[in-house]
């Protein structure tokens, strides 16, 4: 029984550490991949800014349709010196400018309780400084991670139970000759 409890403890700790580490590494890779996409979106927004008769203008014809669909999960905010452009998809939600450029470490609360992965890029266009903030809904990925964690936990527990069952079977088979010897000793003592 002590052997079983020790084995359970070790397998549980090692299994949980491996599962969490692999999920963490997978999420880091996924965030890195999504960062590239967000940078591309920011650069697409940058080249969509043109010089017009009234100063800088954002050519909305060059943007992806998701920016026009309400709560689509794809959002932007472009800040120039004297004007701000926002995606229609934000509706009345305010996408706050992060304190520093680059991919933000923490997710940001978005419209309709979405968890947003946010990137801020600082650029210059036609000699004017611009801050471009792009965001993508990360909520579906979070729910997928949770689902994978639950499935992994279930599979880990099933594997643990299987290992314990096999261990008991192996120990019982290994001790069978000793049980036979104990029975023979009892018969000899009984006469």
Model regions and ranges:
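Helix-start (N-cap) segments at beta->loop->alpha junctions
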Residues: 126-127, 134-154
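Cytosolic-side ends of inner-membrane transmembrane helices, especially those
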Residues: 19-30, 151, 155, 159-175
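Membrane-proximal alpha-helical signal-transduction linkers
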Residues: 173-191
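Extracytoplasmic ligand-binding sensor domains of the Cache superfamily
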Residues: 47-48, 56-113
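Short amphipathic alpha-helical/adjacent loop interface patches that line ligand
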Residues: 42, 138, 182-185
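Juxtamembrane segments flanking the first transmembrane helix
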Residues: 1-74, 143
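A short beta-strand signature within small-molecule sensing/ligand-binding domains used
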Residues: 112-124, 130
């Amino acid at each position: 029984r002590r052997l079983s409890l020790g084995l359970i403890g070790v397998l549980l700790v090692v299994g949980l550490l491996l599962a969490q580490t692999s999920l963490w590494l997978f999420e880091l890779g996924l965030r890195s991949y999504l960062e590239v996409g967000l940078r591309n979106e920011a650069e697409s927004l940058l080249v969509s800014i043109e010089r017009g008769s009234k100063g800088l203008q954002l050519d909305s014809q060059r943007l992806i349709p998701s920016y026009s669909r309400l709560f689509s999960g794809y959002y932007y905010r472009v800040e120039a010196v004297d004007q701000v452009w926002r995606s229609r998809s934000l509706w009345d939600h305010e996408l706050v400018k992060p304190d520093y450029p680059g991919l933000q470490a923490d997710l940001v609360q978005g419209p309709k309780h979405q968890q947003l992965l946010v990137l801020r890029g600082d650029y210059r266009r036609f000699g004017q400084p611009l801050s471009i903030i792009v965001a993508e809904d990360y909520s579906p990925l979070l729910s997928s991670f949770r689902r994978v964690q639950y499935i992994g936990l279930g599979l880990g527990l099933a594997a643990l139970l299987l290992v314990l069952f096999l261990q008991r079977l192996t120990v019982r088979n290994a001790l069978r000759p000793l049980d036979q010897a104990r029975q023979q000793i009892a018969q000899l003592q009984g006469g």
